[in-house]
């Protein structure tokens, strides 16, 4: 336990930030899983495109605001784009 008042405040702030970060990363994880489920289920191209756009938008936002590293955001976007572009070609 913190001994100083300022340390207690920093602990409270840290817990709030940690909860926010976890929530944002969880949202991203859910979006990525939803897109993968749609691809696996061979869903309509428009549904997959909507999932792709929302996932890329979330990745951009998290990368810019440094919730995830910019290179990780770029790598994930590249992987998603490759999945999306190849969707429907293998049929």
UniProtKB/Swiss-Prot annotation:
Bias (Basic and acidic residues) occurs at 1-18
Tell me the superkingdom of the source. Bacteria
Is this entry keyworded Ribosomal protein? yes
Q: Does the keyword Ribonucleoprotein apply?
A: yes
| Keywords from the named record | Ribonucleoprotein, Ribosomal protein, RNA-binding, rRNA-binding
Q: Name one GO biological process term.
A: translation
Its GO CC terms are: cytosol; small ribosomal subunit
Query: What does the record give under GO molecular function?
Result: small ribosomal subunit rRNA binding; structural constituent of ribosome
Task: Return the annotated region ranges for Disordered.
Answer: 1-25
Instruction: Sum up the protein's function in the record's words.
Output: Binds directly to 16S ribosomal RNA.
**Family per similarity comment:** Belongs to the bacterial ribosomal protein bS20 family.
For this entry, the protein name equals: Small ribosomal subunit protein bS20
Source organism: Chlorobium limicola (strain DSM 245 / NBRC 103803 / 6330)
From which lineage does this chain's organism come?
Bacteria, Pseudomonadati, Chlorobiota, Chlorobiia, Chlorobiales
């Amino acid at each position: 336990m913190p001994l100083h008042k300022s340390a207690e405040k920093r602990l409270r702030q840290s817990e709030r930030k940690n909860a926010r970060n976890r929530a944002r990363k969880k949202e991203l994880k859910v979006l990525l899983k939803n897109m993968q489920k749609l691809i696996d289920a061979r869903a309509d191209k428009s549904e997959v495109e909507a999932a792709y756009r929302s996932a890329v938008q979330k990745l951009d936002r998290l990368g810019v605001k440094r919730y995830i590293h910019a290179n990780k955001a770029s790598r994930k976007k590249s992987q998603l784009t490759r999945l999306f572009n190849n969707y429907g070609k293998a049929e």
